Curated annotation (Swiss-Prot):
Residues 1-47 form the Gla domain. Disulfide bonds join 19-24, 52-63, 57-72, 74-83, 89-100, 96-110, 112-125, 133-291, 208-224, 338-352, 363-391. Factor IX is a vitamin K-dependent plasma protein that participates in the intrinsic pathway of blood coagulation by converting factor X to its active form in the presence of Ca(2+) ions, phospholipids, and factor VIIIa. It comes from Sus scrofa. Residues 48-84, 85-126 form the EGF-like domain. This is Coagulation factor IX.
Length: 409
């Protein structure tokens, strides 16, 4: 005879008598099974039904029933109570606050830019130096910049090719040698609000802007450089009509335009250059470098849709230059709209930002200045103010150098 089948029949008969015809207790069920593990499995469904029917676990997860609850065993790459969270970097950046990579075991590995370290939660980034890049350390009352901060929890960057509705623009003529860019329709910045911004003085005072990338180097637009013209960099500048204690002046000892830049062929293609300073800057709350991510993340940050531009350029088309540092939030413009807005060639190393309705833009004198995207309280360089057709004109946009194309350089 088959003792297994006989035992199963005996248990089934006792179970029906003890727990189905009448309500039984756990102890009574235990007497039937004579095994705690089997009793537990039975009891989970007997008390409140099978919580795994239908299966609440998503993305191929396996369901384990429990009393008044259940547990999902998730497939690799998913997590959460119902395996609903993509544990890779594609969704909400893997919950990393700066950079995310997927390791060999398919687990998310968060990391931080230079000057930051991972917090104990292994997601956030904490400053590791007194004046880390991209952070505003001067205390201000709440500003537009702070309120507009982008957080990864609102962003699935796998869908980041979509951009926000058209907002404001930055411009400079591709034809005229004196059509440098300025901020039109912007706001007065607060002292120390854009501590990476520098002013370039040459044979014309305040002719361009730039961004601090470390104590010895500044990045600007290549078309701002003229052979034989001495350039002075002013960091910590705020009001150009006053000499302020926050200012630091350095001479440029070497200007390095990108090796593909050729002004005789096209003045604004590959419009990026590095400036080496004669003495290191002293970093403080008013003189702080901008963060630069790798190529992938610089492109991701740009596609978030909105960035900030700043400078001392003209405050209206063909008007006077600003004396107080100006800033403006500008939306990224999709490439098709950008190409339709002009007869001038827009190369793949450029992008458009600004407002279709006009009235706000960068303008003459802003060239070389930063286009930054603030992410989780840290600002990253995503563009360089390059050119445009006039300033703040309806249907025209500001054209910027796409920094992601030059990070490795």
């Amino acid at each position: 005879y088959n003792s297994g089948k006989l035992e199963e029949s005996f248990v089934r008969g006792n179970l029906e008598r003890e727990c189905i015809e009448e309500k039984c207790s756990f102890e009574e069920a235990r007497e039937v099974f004579e095994n705690t593990e089997k009793t537990n499995e039975f009891w989970k469904q007997y008390v409140d039904g099978d919580q795994c029917e239908p299966n609440p676990c998503l993305n191929g997860g396996l369901c384990k029933d429990d009393i008044n609850s259940y547990e999902c065993w998730c497939q690799v790459g998913f997590e959460g109570k119902n395996c609903e969270l993509d544990a890779t970097c594609n969704i909400k950046n893997g919950r990393c606050k700066q950079f995310c990579k997927t390791g060999a075991d398919s687990k998310v590995l968060c990391s931080c830019t230079t000057g930051y370290r991972l917090a104990p939660d292994q997601k956030s980034c904490k400053p590791a130096v007194p004046f880390p890049c991209g952070r505003v350390s001067v205390s201000h009352s709440p500003t537009t910049l702070t309120r507009a901060e982008i957080i990864f929890s609102n962003m699935d960057y796998e869908n980041s090719t979509e951009v926000e509705p058209i907002l404001d623009s930055l411009t400079e003529s591709n034809q005229s040698s004196d059509d440098f860019i300025r901020i039109v329709g912007g706001e007065n910045a607060k002292p120390g609000q854009f501590p990476w911004q520098v002013l370039l003085n040459g044979k014309i005072d305040a002719f361009c802007g730039g961004s601090i990338i470390n104590e010895k180097w500044v990045v600007t637009a290549a078309h701002c450089i003229e052979p034989g013209v001495k350039i002075t960099v002013v960091a910590g500048e705020y009001n150009t009509e006053e000499t302020e204690p926050t200012e630091q002046r350095r001479n440029v000892i070497r200007a390095i335009p990108h090796h593909s830049y050729n002004a005789t062929v096209n003045k604004y293609s590959h419009d990026i250059a590095l400036l080496e300073l004669d003495e290191p800057l002293t970093l403080n709350s008013y003189v702080t470098p901008i963060c630069i991510a790798d190529k992938e993340y610089t492109n991701i940050f740009l596609k978030f849709g909105s960035g900030y531009v700043s400078g001392w350029g003209r405050v209206f088309n063909r008007g006077r230059s600003a004396t107080i540092l100006q800033y403006l939030k500008v939306p990224l413009v999709d490439r098709a709209t950008c190409l339709r807005s002009t007869k001038v060639t827009i190369y793949s190393n450029m992008f458009c930002a600004g407002f279709h309705e006009g009235g706000k833009d960068s303008c003459l004198g802003d060239s070389g200045g930063p286009h930054v995207t603030e992410v989780e309280g840290t600002s990253f360089l995503t563009g360089i103010i390059s050119w445009g057709e006039e300033c703040a004109v309806k249907g025209k946009y500001g054209i910027y150098t796409k920094v992601s194309r030059y990070v490795n350089w």
